[in-house]
Amino acid sequence: MISPLPLSELELLNSVFRRHAEIRVVKLFGSRAKGTHTPQSDVDLAIWGEVDPLQAEQIAAELDELPLPYRYDVQPFENIKLLPLRAHIERVGISIYPPRPNVP
């Protein structure tokens, strides 16, 4: 599936993810993944890897420093207890990291 975020923005996000060796996979979910977002919508990200909630907050803070007009909600997938939310992420989540060949 093609990401709803422009290539240049994905490259900036991935520059943050690359600084964290513990991150294995990042998926975009929520309204941006479904294409129902508004200009005020945040960017919902689920992270797989050895990432605890405190590290997720640090990653979100680093993303907030990027020159992009978004707010970020970063969740370690392992810590998400709500089964419907986990199912939503598995169903509509769009993998944005690691980049695939020819796709950031």
Residue ranges and their predicted role:
Residues M1-V25, K34-P39, W48-P104:
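Catalytic core of pol beta-like nucleotidyltransferases
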